[in-house]
Structure formats: structure tokens, C-alpha cells
Amino acid sequence: MQNLNGRFAAVLPAGGLGKRMGGNIPKQLMLLGGKPVYRYSLETFLEMEESAEVVMAVPADWKDHFEKEFSHPKLKIVIGGAERWQSVENGVNALTSSAEFVLVHDVARPFVSKEIIRDVCETLITKGSCLVAKPAVDTIKIAADGKVQKTIDRNTVWMAQTPQAASIALLKKLYGRIAAEPLNFTPTDEASILEYFGENVYIVKGNVANDKLTTPEDFEIFASRTR
């Protein structure tokens, strides 16, 4: 294994308001096992020697709260954008270390493992841009207006997760191209931006533990993992 220490930065988009969760505070600030959701993945990245720095993009109205609640020498908190990809762009532009690569991870995936993060780092160095994804286990249907159109071979389907990773220089170049010629769609992750511009994106196998916290039902399931 190569020496990965200090070669990577992390950007953690935490700007969503989690409307599907309900409540009056962002879901990333809700307590999970007595600790705010965002702290789980944030602390995992901060603990890793591979990480040179971590930037977290948060809602503008909550920036002071985050800064008062948690600080770390490797952590910088910035204001997120209107869309997730713009929050990531703000985070990437705020990086100041000598790191070559960036891993983007949703704080709503609190149980990402250090093993998966290291697998992403290794894949990024040996192959190129990559994302974590888990293989589909259910039969996948394409439907329109409530009517099934066709069935997809699930062996070719992967459910995207995070981290998603690329070189910092590459992402900055692509953000520059978007500024010059805006996209005709709203990307929901970094991989879709890379794909749009013809970049190869490799898969790192994920797992159920790395699923995203989205609904109140998810919250109950995730809370049971902290007991």
C-alpha cells in the first residue's frame, strides 16, 4: 500500500435542510446516539492521517452554530450553495492544503468506514476518479405514469453512495467549464459531473452500513446501530 498520508482533503456537504425528516433543525444536527449526525463522518475523516484538511459546507443561517459547536485544526467551515454540487464547489475552492485529491462525502451517511475511505484513496491513485456504490439487490423496473416500461438487468445497476473522489485540479477545471457554459441539468453528485464531461469514474464497493439517513424511519434504524 502506498503512503497516502496528507495526500487527500475531504469536502463534506452539510447544507441540506432535510425536509423529509421534518423538525425545526437540519437533520445533520439531530442527535443520533447522543451525538449530532454530522459528527460521525466528520470525526472519521479528521482522525485519518490520509486527510490533510476537511471542509464542511453548511447552511448560511447555521454557520455560527456549527463553528461554536465543534472546532479542529484541520477543519474549515464554509457556507453551502443553493444546490449540493454548488456546496461542494464552495468547499473545493476553500481548500488550502497541498493535498492532490479530494473526497466528497455526505454527512447524512454517518457510518462510513475508514476501510472504505482508504479503498477510495487507493482506487483514486491507481485508476482515477471514483465513487462508492453498492450493487442492486432488488429487481429494477423503469416506469412512466405508474406503468412498467421495462426491467433492467440488476447485475449492471449500482446504487451510488459517497465518498466520491477526484483530483482537486480536475474538479476545479470542470467547475470552470460549468461557469462558462452552465449545465442543462442539476447534478446530484460529483460522478454525474465527471460523466457529463467524459471522465472515467470507477466503482469502489460500498455496503448497507454506508446508506444515507433520509427519513424518520431511517433515523430509527440508524439509532439502533449506536446502542
Residue ranges of each PLM-predicted region?
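N-terminal glycine-rich phosphate-binding loop and ensuing alpha1 helix
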Residues: 2-61
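Conserved alpha/beta core of the MobA/IspD/sugar-nucleotide pyrophosphorylase nucleotidyltransferase superfamily
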Residues: 2-6, 158-227
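Short pre-catalytic strand/loop immediately N-terminal to key active-site residues, enriched for Gly-Thr
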Residues: 76-79, 154-159
